[in-house]
Regions:
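Small, basic N-terminal interaction modules of short regulatory proteins
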Residues: 1-85
Length: 85
């Protein structure tokens, strides 16, 4: 569980990034066309990329720290889609 998630949102392209921790980027694993998880070389999660969160909402399945991510997204009125495939 992490309490220091930082959400950045670019309205012009409807894209969000949630920073989990500051570290050098090593690789990204795409969960689907709208979601990717960024990792450091040690395998720790450093961020979450979300495309079209305002237009399509955000699925939590497969995301790390789903409770914290949900709270951050709902705080800026993004629709959270739990249990949807």
């Amino acid at each position: 569980m992490t309490n220091n998630l930082l959400l950045e949102y670019d309205e012009s392209v409807d894209a969000a990034y949630i920073t989990v921790k500051e570290a050098d980027w090593d690789h990204q694993v795409r969960l689907d066309d709208a979601r990717g998880i960024d990792y450091a070389a040690d395998g720790s999660v450093i961020g979450i990329e979300i495309l079209s969160p305002r237009r399509k909402g955000v699925r939590l399945d497969g995301l790390p720290f789903p409770g914290d991510v949900s709270r951050v997204l709902q705080a800026v009125s993004f629709r959270v889609l739990e249990g949807v495939r």
